[in-house]
Amino acid sequence: MQIAVTGATGFLGHYIAQNLASDGHQLRCWHRPSSNRQPLDALSHQVTWLPGDLSDASSAATLVDGCDAVVHGALWRTGSTFRKNTSDLIEFTETNLLGTLRLIEAARKAGVKRFIFISTCAVHEEILDDRPLDETHPLWPRTHYGGP
């Protein structure tokens, strides 16, 4: 399969990209100028890197063109780590939410049949002891990153 991956240079994303490539898939991955692509250098014969980010609708269309699936794990943020995000909440939400919607729409227009959106454990800053940690567990994020 040809799979578009956003966030491939991130913590989870590079593991996902490695696993998809080891299963024989061809990948089209977004990168920003500041991205560290070195952990995926060994996969260069299976990975096509394309410049792009969540704020650019045309790069979303280019990324998903010809793909069978999308794995979306990208995040726009400022600050040194995702948990110490210093960006304005409005800018953070607009860029990530609208960027994700642009990516979904680009995938729909391109006829992509599968779209996987990766969340984060940061939605569960507080975990209740009396129930399992599953999709019914209440969400209590403390940062923009874990927020809705």
Predicted regions and their residues:
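NAD(P)H-binding glycine-rich loop region in Rossmannoid oxidoreductase-like domains
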Residues: 45, 51-95, 106
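Conserved hydrophobic beta-strands of the Rossmann-like cofactor-binding core
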Residues: 3-5, 70, 115
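Conserved glycine-rich Rossmann-like NAD(P)H-binding loop of the short-chain dehydrogenase/reductase
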Residues: 25-35
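Residues at the starts of beta-strands that form the adenosine-phosphate
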Residues: 2, 26-27, 113-114
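N-terminal Rossmann NAD(P)H-binding glycine-rich loop of SDR-like oxidoreductase domains
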Residues: 3-23
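Short, conserved SAM-binding/catalytic segment
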Residues: 36-47
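Glycine-rich NAD(P)-binding loop of the Rossmann-fold in SDR/ketoreductase-type enzymes
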Residues: 55, 91-102, 143, 147-148
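Conserved Rossmann-fold NAD(P)-dependent oxidoreductase catalytic core, especially the SDR/UDP-sugar
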Residues: 72, 98-144
